[in-house]
Amino acid sequence: MLKCGMTGGQVKVFGKAVQTLSRVSDELWLDPSEKGLALRSVNSCHSTYGYVLFSSMFFQHYQWSPFATMSDTDLPLNLNCKLAIKSVLPIFRCLNYLERSVEKCTVVARADKCRVVIQFFGKHGIKRTHNVYFQDSQPLKIIFEKSLCANILMIKPRLLTEAIALLTSNQEEVTFSVTPGNFCLKSLSGELLDLTSSVYSEMSFGPEEFDFFQVGLDTEITFCFKELKGILTFSEVMHAPLAIYFDFPGKPVVLSVEDMLLEANFILATLVDYPSRTSSPQLLPLSQARRSHPIQSSAPEDKSRVSQTPESISRAAPKRLFPKDSPDSSSAAETKRASAGQDDIFEVPESVVSDMEEERSPSHLRKFSCMFFGAVSCEQQEYAGHPLDSLAVASDSEEDVSG
């Protein structure tokens, strides 16, 4: 059983979390525990996973029991709630209005009733009740050690929001390129499209613009753009910095927002650059001494001051594929594949690369890696040893919701 209460201001934050997760999938899990209430969502191809954990201290009152019993059989039942996001989203659509008019909100769920009851208590004794029925489905849980990533950045969401405003509205992917002395946001990846019919945008930030800047690996990653916009909006509502954790192309990127009362993490698959992956073992074993020194100072007021740039780590991975009609490039690519096959010890369990390296078509050489969640729920652990090949697509719901 779950029973919790919120004020109007807390309802706005809770509703913004629901709106952000609606960009990931059309399904939402309520996962209560002793620590608090977690909202989870994963898209159909398992390339994007997001969860927001509200601490028990976030709510006015929080009551949870791990089991419930049916009146006729007295069998214990776990509370596993899977809701349709289209049923929940309209309840939290007008967040500014809810913040002003709602004095109290309660959320009650029971496993034997198969429904979640959300009640709003407003001024002048007005009460509004929503009954949302759920399916009994255990949520997907993953374990990803984001603190072990080579590159860790922390930036104020307003700066990144102003940067992505330069991108076109129909943008589907965004590229982050980092070196120890620079961060670059691009609308297209290294393998550019036809510039005669495309708009290419690029913006660079120095390390002094970040609250925390640690780059241990020169890299360039490409991932879906829509989820980035959603978590930036959520980060602004929380007035908390956005943390970015990533390594090399093909391994997931984590966008994280942490506060004393809640924690939000979005794990996104990135595009695989096959030539870069074959040469990545030359870049991975970096000693701590070769990493750029983390910067933990806020952006200075005097922008004219030029900061010292740490020595860059040479990038061994090529940014473009070898020409298809070049015999020398083709033989060089075959040599790299052979050498990578002999001592490839850098398997990444969190991401699975589609086995398409034998294809010659350029359209198949760079694909999204499907995230494979090594730690899943008990019903799915028996399949954890079998990678799931899939291509990342845009999130299930393309609907933009405004706060």
Swiss-Prot record:
Pfam families: Rad9 (PF04139)
Location of Phosphoserine modifications: 354, 363
Gene Ontology terms: cellular component: checkpoint clamp complex; nucleus
Gene Ontology BP, a term: DNA damage checkpoint signaling
Keywords: Phosphoprotein
Protein name: Cell cycle checkpoint control protein RAD9B
InterPro entries: DNA_clamp_sf (IPR046938), Rad9 (IPR026584), Rad9/Ddc1 (IPR007268)
Region (Disordered): 285-347
Keyword Acyltransferase: no
Known partners and oligomeric status: Interacts with HUS1, HUS1B, RAD1, RAD9A and RAD17.
Xref: PANTHER family: CELL CYCLE CHECKPOINT CONTROL PROTEIN RAD9B, DNA REPAIR PROTEIN RAD9
Organism this protein belongs to: Mus musculus (Mouse)
CDD domains according to UniProt: PCNA
Protein family according to the UniProt entry: Belongs to the rad9 family.
UniProt gene name: Rad9b
Superkingdom of the organism of origin: Eukaryota
